[in-house]
C-alpha cells in the first residue's frame, strides 16, 4: 500500500533571490528596488514548490545523465487530453495539439500565421500586456475595445464598442479567464464573442492559461471551444500547465487547433522557426496532469482564495482603493483612482514607500490607468506583510 501523498506546504517561505529568478532578482533593474526586504508581486509565477510528482519526473531525467534530442512524448499528449477531458469536459483529438514555447510564443505564432503587416488585432482592454507587445512587434496594429464595469467586475460592452472597428481587423485575442481582472467569462458571453468574430471574419485566439486557477465559489470556467463549437474553423485555444503548476521555466504550452486547415497554417510557422518541445518540459507536464496534480491544484486554489480574502480586506481599509473581485487567477487588480493620486504618485508610495514591485496598470491598455496588479501567489505571511506596508504607505489618507 503506497503512502498517502504529502500535503503541499504553501506557507513555506522559499528564498528565490540569487536563483536567476526574474521575479525576485530583476526588481532592481526594473523598479529600482534593491532593498533586501523588497517584495516581488509583479511577474505571474508563484512562490510555491511544484507538486512532488513533477519534481520526481525532473529528477529522473537529470539522473540519466543524457540530455540529447527528445522524440515525440506520447505520455505528454495523453496527459493533456486526459486533463482537458476530466477537468474541463473537453475531448481533444491528439492531432489537434501543437506544442509551443509558452503562450506568449503561441500568441505570436498565431499573429504571424493569420494576419499580415498592417492588419489590426482586437484586444478587450485592460488586458494582459504581452498581447499588445506581440502584436505591435509583428508590425500589426491594436484595436482596443475597452471593457465596461458592472457590479465591480469587467463586462462586455457591445453598445459602447459600436463603430470602433476600422475594417483592418483580422483577429481577436481573448484572455479567458481574464487577466488582470480575474473574471471568469460565462458560456453566454463566450458565444457572443464567437458570434462577433464570425460576423466580422476574425480569427479568435483564446488564451486560457489561467483556466485551472478558478477560485472556490466562483463560476465554472467554460472552454471557448465548448461554448461555441460553431467557431471551430476559426478558433485557436492556448493552454498550458505552466501557470497552474508553477512551471513557467519549462517554456511549454499548447496550441489546440481542431480545424486541419487552420492548424496547417500554424504548424507551418512553427516549422519555419524550428519550434518543438525540449527534453524537460513534457515529462513535467505529464506528471502534473495527473490525479495527484488535480489534488494539488484543488489545495492551491483554496489557499489562493484565502490569500485573496486577506489581501482584499487590507486594500479595503485604504480610502479610495478597491480590489476587483477575484474569480480566477492569483492576480489582484487594484483600482487606486478613488485616492486621487496619479500613476507617478502611486509608484512613489508602493515602490518607494512600501518597497513592493507590482505591475503598472497603464501597460494593460485603456482602463488600466491608476491601477496596479499584485501577484498574491505567495505564502500568506508575505501577503499580510504587503497589506501592512500598503496601509502604511497610504496612511495619510485616513
Q: How would you describe each model-predicted region?
A:
Residues 138, 199-200, 354, 397:
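Helix C-cap/helix->beta junction micro-motif
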Residues 286, 302-312, 323-336, 368:
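Conserved glycine-rich beta-strand-loop-beta hairpin in the small C-terminal domain of fold type I
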Amino acid at each position: 500500500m503506497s503512502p498517502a501523498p504529502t500535503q503541499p506546504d504553501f506557507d513555506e517561505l522559499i528564498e528565490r533571490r540569487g536563483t536567476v529568478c526574474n521575479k525576485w532578482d530583476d526588481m532592481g533593474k526594473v523598479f529600482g528596488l534593491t532593498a533586501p526586504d523588497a517584495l516581488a508581486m509583479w511577474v505571474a509565477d508563484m512562490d510555491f514548490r511544484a507538486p512532488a510528482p513533477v519534481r520526481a519526473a525532473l529528477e529522473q531525467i537529470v539522473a540519466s545523465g543524457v540530455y540529447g534530442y527528445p522524440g515525440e512524448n506520447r505520455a505528454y499528449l495523453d496527459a493533456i487530453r486526459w486533463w482537458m477531458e476530466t477537468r474541463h469536459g473537453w475531448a481533444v483529438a491528439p492531432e489537434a495539439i501543437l506544442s509551443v514555447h509558452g503562450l506568449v510564443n503561441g500568441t505570436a505564432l498565431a499573429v504571424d500565421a493569420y494576419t499580415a503587416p498592417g492588419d489590426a488585432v482586437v484586444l478587450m482592454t485592460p488586458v494582459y500586456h504581452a498581447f499588445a507587445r506581440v502584436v505591435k512587434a509583428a508590425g500589426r496594429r491594436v484595436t482596443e475595445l475597452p471593457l465596461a464595469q458592472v457590479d465591480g467586475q469587467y463586462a462586455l460592452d457591445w453598445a459602447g464598442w459600436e463603430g470602433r472597428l476600422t475594417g483592418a481587423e483580422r483577429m481577436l485575442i481573448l484572455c479567458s479567464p481574464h487577466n488582470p481582472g480575474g473574471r471568469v467569462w460565462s458560456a453566454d458571453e463566450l458565444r457572443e464573442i464567437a458570434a462577433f468574430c464570425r460576423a466580422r471574419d476574425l480569427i479568435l485566439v483564446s488564451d486560457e492559461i489561467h483556466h485551472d486557477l478558478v477560485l472556490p465559489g466562483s463560476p465554472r470556467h467554460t472552454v471557448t471551444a465548448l461554448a461555441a463549437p460553431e467557431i471551430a474553423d476559426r478558433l485557436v485555444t492556448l493552454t498550458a500547465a505552466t501557470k497552474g503548476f508553477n512551471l513557467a521555466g519549462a517554456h511549454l504550452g499548447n496550441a489546440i487547433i481542431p480545424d486541419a486547415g487552420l492548424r496547417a497554417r500554424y504548424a507551418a510557422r512553427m516549422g519555419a522557426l524550428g519550434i518543438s518541445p525540449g527534453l524537460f518540459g513534457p515529462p513535467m507536464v505529464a506528471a502534473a496532469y495527473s490525479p495527484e496534480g488535480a489534488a494539488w491544484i484543488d489545495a492551491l486554489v483554496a489557499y489562493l482564495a484565502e490569500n485573496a480574502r486577506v489581501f482584499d480586506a487590507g486594500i479595503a481599509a485604504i480610502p479610495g482603493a478597491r480590489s476587483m473581485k477575484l474569480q480566477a487567477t492569483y492576480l489582484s487588480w487594484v483600482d487606486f483612482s478613488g485616492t486621487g493620486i496619479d500613476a507617478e504618485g502611486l509608484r512613489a508610495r508602493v515602490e518607494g514607500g512600501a518597497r513592493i514591485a507590482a505591475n503598472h496598470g497603464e501597460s494593460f491598455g485603456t482602463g488600466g490607468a491608476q491601477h496596479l496588479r499584485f501577484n498574491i501567489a505567495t505564502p500568506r505571511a508575505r501577503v499580510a506583510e504587503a497589506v501592512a506596508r500598503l496601509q502604511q504607505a497610504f496612511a495619510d489618507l485616513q
